[in-house]
Amino acid sequence: MNPNQKIITIGSISLGLVVFNILLHVVSIIITVLVLGKGGNNGVCNGTIVREYNETVRIEKVTQWHNTSVVEYLPYWNEGTYMNNTEAICDVKGFAPFSKDNGIRIGSRGHVFVIREPFVSCSPIECRTFFLTQGSLLNDKHSNGTVKDRSPFRTLMSVEVGQSPNVYQARFEAVAWSATACHDGKKWMTVGVTGPDSKAVAVIHYGGVPTDVINSWAGDILRTQESSCTCIQGDCYWVMTDGPANRQAQYRIYKAKQGRIVGQTDVNFNGGHIEECSCYPNDGKVECVCRDNWTGTNRPVLVISPDLSYRVGYLCAGLPSDTPRGEDAQFTGSCTSPMGNQGYGVKGFGFRQGTDVWMGRTISRTSRSGFEILRVKNGWTQTSKEQVRKQIVVDNLNWSGYSGSFTLPVELTGKDCLVPCFWVEMIRGKPEEKTIWTSSSSIVMCGVDYEVADWSWHDGAILPFDIDKM
């Protein structure tokens, strides 16, 4: 065989091997497609298949990577169904940590909003933290002067519970310097109050769209709860105040369906003062524990029926739960009248447990520092001083602030009762600390069947920030 013949032979063999290799690849691809097709994914690789089972309360999310399937069970909720929320509050022995956002610590180097008045509310599939921003970020020049309550820059925004109030995950809800929000099982409803003090307007959003408005009727800082409103079988209830903060004001209960007001009633409470109610559903009614900013160091109680009839009075317990307040030993308690003769106050909460009450309060009697929750035997119906349980959440060496209530719906927990939960705001900056700004973070606790040890889940940010040193 001469050299030319050798070259031709070697070339022919090489070409044959290349063709054979190509054929093997084609056959391999055909077999792979046929096998995956028979596996029930309609020939789609790297895809996501969502199978919905009406007979269960889940969605099965199957992500397929070639021949590997990852199954993730997602909560399922039919958006055509209202939440019931007529169940009783679960009887609990203590409160366990649910979430903590650490917003101010993160905000020293992250894009975190300057906020106040955070609160939590839940849908059938998630809980969200709502908060009133100041239209500025921590450690930025626009944070200067944010101790002010009402400005045109304040907005209601929300994140999933536990997330910091950061720029990247926050969702806009409403323009507001006072607000409430709740979910009826279908969509979120928010109420955001904004505008001048004498002519403020509350704009109701349902599913993110403005649906109704409430104009100030007394011309003196229309305001609302700063915590979750309450939805029962599709109807949502909340309380508003219009009038002075240090003497008799006017109070109204509102009822809305799909974001449109379907009823309202004035609350007759001469000699009493109601602000910033913390409300929750219990046995088919709305129970609210509020703030008396006029004279009382005991908290007003408002119980609302679906027909908007109501019962109003004060938390009976023989222990005061507002701040500032006097000594426990000197307080007698009353179910009908303000007691303690101390002006000012702070937003707080309580939960009825039969005839007992869980009541939260600052540990300090004079300032917003520390936080504890007490169970007082027969404290909902009698002027009892008997503490059967006490749990410390923030020690008295650290700042606290507002606190409020919400519940975990049965659709979320699978229980046959509503889990009581509360949040504690931890205010940092002005007026207590040497900064140019005021903001807060929060700790969230939920009721459990066990006693929980005392600890301090305080804010923990090291101040001042760089912006405060300029």
Where are these regions (language model features)?
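Solvent-exposed helix/loop surface patches that form functional interfaces
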Residues: 348
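Short, low-complexity, Lys/Arg-enriched N-terminal segments of secretory-pathway carbohydrate enzymes
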Residues: 1-3
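Alpha-helical transmembrane segments in eukaryotic/viral proteins
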Residues: 8-41
